[in-house]
């Protein structure tokens, strides 16, 4: 067969993908497709969102407990103890990301996620009984170990169920659910502090104890209801499962997992795009963690009372949830990623400048709204952008783990540049966060240029992208 004919076939594949919005769906009743997708949505997204909300609360409630009296009891005001206790969680969180994702398929999502949730719930519970700063750090290390595989597993599982331009709304939906609940955790924690002295236990310790118990109970719920991968799912009938797999195969040709090899591992690990997305994810999580760990402290430093600081912490998260879903809907609707991520970077920068440099507390507080709105939407946005532009589940497992591990580096960055010495405005931390946003804008520009160029070559029959004929990058 001639090379010219090969090129014509490649161009035909591309045109079929571009012109047929739902090629695999055409064989099924649209009502059947929509009903099945709704079943998947309701079975998966609320529960995973709730579990991730608990994960966010358990990793970031240190700032709330500090304001509630832990600082005095454990002497976290000495040197950089608070920053170290916050940061040390991320070391095992980063180290165990890739190994966790590699065993996820072998172990199965239900067992894997249950072990993660119950394990970090026990670590959270233990934090309520620590007598000193050193043991607090030990519990934070255990928390990082058990949470390490959780978020990449969630992203991996969700992205195997949907077509590329359906993913960001779903990622945003479970993330939205988590940040709303996480935002109101400060008010819940404030209520728990009224248990101060009950059973001879301090109010801040009760925050860890009660939230740890809830987490362990949710681990049991995960065992009962968390869905597995599409090819292993049991809550769908055979026709529904076949339809889901056919949609994924038509969309990106990776409905069936391909075996992992060392060659595939290293190709995915050293792919420049893996690290481009990883640095973008770091740049997104850095301000999100900064708000999570320091919002209550910053608000308290504006002159608000302790009680008011707890209450006011919640509302920037509500705004972030609305913004997050709006941009996710816009991205899926337009089938564009980079431009909407860039818009959120600009919003985040504006918020950081307002919080850092405005003189009026109300304006500084409004800056936290903008910062959280810009940062939070980028977290699912970067993950969707990445998942749209790869095929093969082996590559998805490795690259997703690397990217989310770099999110842990963003957590380390946030907890170390917002230093106690810079309280209450944390100006060096503000500028470090702005630098992350500018870095992300540069990477978005580079990715867009390279993707555009390669798509043009693929349309001309000069290149096959991701070893998948007809595949085009999402820009």
Task: Give the label of every model feature segment.
Residues 63-95:
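Extracellular/periplasmic helix-loop-helix junction of adjacent transmembrane segments
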Residues 111-125, 339-354:
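Structural signature of the two symmetry-related core transmembrane helices
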Residues 168-201, 208-215, 400-414:
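Glycine-rich segments within core transmembrane alpha-helices of 12-TM secondary carriers
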Residues 94-134:
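Conserved MFS/SLC helix-loop-helix module at the cytosolic interface between two early adjacent transmembrane helices
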Residues 63-64, 263-329, 379, 383-384, ...:
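Extracytoplasmic gate region of multi-pass secondary transporters
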Residues 149-162, 377-392:
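Intracellular juxtamembrane helix-capping segments at the cytosolic ends
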Residues 95-108, 322-336:
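Helix-to-loop junctions at the C-terminal end of transmembrane segments
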């Amino acid at each position: 067969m001639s090379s010219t004919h090969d090129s014509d076939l490649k161009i035909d594949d591309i045109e079929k993908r571009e012109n047929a919005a739902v090629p695999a769906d055409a064989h099924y009743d649209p009502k059947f497709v929509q009903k099945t997708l709704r079943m998947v949505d309701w079975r998966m997204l609320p529960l995973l969102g709730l579990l991730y909300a608990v994960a966010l609360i358990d990793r970031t409630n240190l700032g709330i407990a500090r304001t509630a009296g832990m600082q005095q009891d454990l002497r976290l005001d000495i040197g950089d103890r608070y920053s170290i206790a916050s940061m040390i969680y991320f070391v095992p969180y980063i180290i165990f990301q890739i190994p966790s994702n590699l065993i996820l398929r072998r172990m199965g999502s239900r067992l894997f996620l249950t072990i993660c949730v119950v394990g970090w719930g026990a670590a959270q519970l233990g934090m309520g009984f620590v007598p000193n700063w050193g043991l607090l750090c030990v519990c934070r290390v255990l928390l990082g170990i058990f949470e390490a595989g959780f978020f990449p597993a969630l992203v991996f599982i969700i992205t195997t169920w949907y077509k590329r331009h359906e993913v960001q709304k779903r990622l945003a939906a479970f993330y939205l659910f988590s940040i709303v609940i996480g935002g109101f955790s400060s008010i819940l924690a404030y209520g728990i502090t009224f248990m101060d002295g009950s059973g001879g236990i301090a109010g801040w310790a009760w925050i860890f104890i009660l939230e740890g118990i809830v987490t362990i109970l949710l681990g049991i719920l995960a065992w009962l209801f968390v869905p597995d991968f599409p090819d292993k799912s049991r809550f769908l009938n055979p026709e529904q499962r076949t339809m889901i797999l056919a949609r994924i195969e038509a969309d990106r040709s990776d409905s069936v997992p391909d075996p992992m090899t060392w060659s595939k591992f290293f190709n995915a690990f050293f792919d420049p795009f893996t690290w481009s997305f990883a640095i973008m994810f770091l740049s997104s999580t850095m301000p999100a963690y900064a708000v999570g760990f320091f919002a209550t402290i910053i608000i308290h430093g504006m002159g608000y009372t302790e009680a008011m600081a707890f209450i006011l912490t919640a509302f920037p998260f509500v705004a972030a949830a609305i913004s997050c879903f709006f941009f996710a809907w816009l991205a899926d609707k337009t089938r564009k990623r980079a431009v909407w991520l860039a818009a959120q970077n600009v919003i985040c920068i504006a918020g950081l400048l307002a919080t850092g440099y405005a003189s009026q507390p109300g304006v500084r507080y409004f800056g936290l709204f903008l910062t959280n709105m810009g940062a939070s939407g980028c977290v699912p946005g970067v993950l969707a952008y990445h998942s749209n532009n790869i095929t093969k589940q082996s590559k998805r497992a490795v690259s997703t783990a690397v990217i989310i591990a770099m999110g842990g580096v963003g957590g380390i960055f946030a907890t170390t540049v917002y230093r106690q010495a810079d309280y209450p405005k944390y100006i060096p931390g503000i500028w470090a966060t702005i630098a992350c946003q500018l870095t992300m804008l540069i990477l978005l520009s580079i990715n867009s240029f390279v993707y555009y160029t390669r798509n043009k070559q693929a349309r001309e029959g000069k290149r096959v992208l991701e070893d998948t004929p007809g595949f085009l990058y999402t820009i």
